[in-house]
Amino acid sequence: MKKLFKYLFAVLLISLSGKAQTNDDSSYDYVKAFKTDFYSNTSNNVRSASGKPGAQYWQNKADYLIDVRLDTLSDIISGKEIITYTNNSPDELDFLWLQLDQNAFKNDSKGSAVIPIRGSRAGTGGEKLDGGFKISAVQLISGKGSKKSVSNADYEVYGTRMKINLPKTLRANGGEIKIKIDFSFLSPYYGSDRMGIVETKNGKIYSIAQFHPRMCVYDDLNGWNTLPYIGQGEFYLEYGDFNINITAPSDHIVLCSGELLNPLETYTLDQLNRWAQADASDSTVMIRTPEEINDPSSRPDGKKTITWRYRMENTRDIAWASSSAFIVDAARINLPSGKSSRAISAYPIESYGNNAWERSTEYTKASVEHYSERWYEYPYSTAINIASSVAGIEYPAVSFCSYKSRGGRLWGVTDHEFGHNWFPMIVGSNERLYGWMDEGF
């Protein structure tokens, strides 16, 4: 009887289960459940269903002229910039949005409120500092020649964003305006594992990024993309041309995204000859040796500071590093078209030897050559790996990787970060919203 009861109970359960599964009144919609929210339009005049730009594709442009100065006594970076913003969209713009990512490191920022003091990659790692941008001037420049006018901007700051209300609508389809901003900030030692400072035997290494106000992206999907930066989530930026002047102490070597325009002013004659050797070599060539770090003759004579001038075209971002402690080496990168680029590594004496950073240029060269064959030819004149306080982060043509890494770990992080030059740096995806697109790839 007991067995019969168990049998009948099992039959009843199976019957009820079957009815539940065939219930036509279910509100579940599998199409809605699995529909993507990152590409809702399968095809239009701007974006085709194949992923290629449509016949009326547009994107706005932001060109930057930047002058910055590094004060190694205070760790303050001060500067000014002129942004030339071109509105290629079909929409007139009454206001502009900019990103102030350094504001994430203010004590009263949203990031400081929501990021754990310890145990998180984001934030300042518990460091308390008077961080964030100090904006001393924002001006609008319109017109050219005799019609040029300069006026103080009407702007508001909302956390890590700045809104500029325009006195006159910026016209669609090519309207242009210039924005001049004077700024400064105190660099954190640990800036969300994306920038920072590390102290070494022979001086501090400054790994500097998100160091100037940058335009938010205005696109056809979301209009202004103004999601705040709280330390987590990376970046979405307009493309443009960058010209930057970086003034640092004369015993420093400064490496930056792009092409160095004044090598004769920044390197010695011996070092210039070594650069020429590196450009013709598939093996690593020392530019500044470990023995030369504290040798005054390894730096140009006669000045307390040197201004390094760099230029990079058609990029969404730049980053730079500065230190008196750098050993520097380089080698040629061979590209599929027959052109070449330059692999460069800069690291302190603590990172030299025992299968460590003396192999970084070898790893950088191998990574860029591989991805150039596999995906798309590397478009930049240099690929620079900086030994840093940062565990691993990518910027166009520059990576910051831990100065403690060595062996397979150094190879892995170097290869990963330089792979990011294709995704998202060349592709230009929205990392703030869809970080999985480049990290997951």
Q: Which ranges hold each PLM region?
A:
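Bacterial Sec-dependent N-terminal signal peptides
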Residues: 1-24
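N-terminal, polar/Ser/Thr-rich
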Residues: 21-78
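A surface-exposed beta-strand-loop module
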Residues: 23-28, 67, 76, 86, ...
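Short, hydrophobic/aromatic-enriched beta-strand segments in well-ordered soluble domains
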Residues: 81-83, 87, 100-102, 175-189, ...
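Solvent-exposed beta-hairpin/edge-strand motifs
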Residues: 97-147, 247-252
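Glycine/proline-rich low-complexity spacer/linker segments in large multi-domain proteins
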Residues: 108-126, 184-242, 263-264
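Hydrophobic helix-coil surface modules that form long, contiguous segments used
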Residues: 213-224, 230-415, 439
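Catalytic Zn2+-binding segment of zinc metalloproteases
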Residues: 421-434
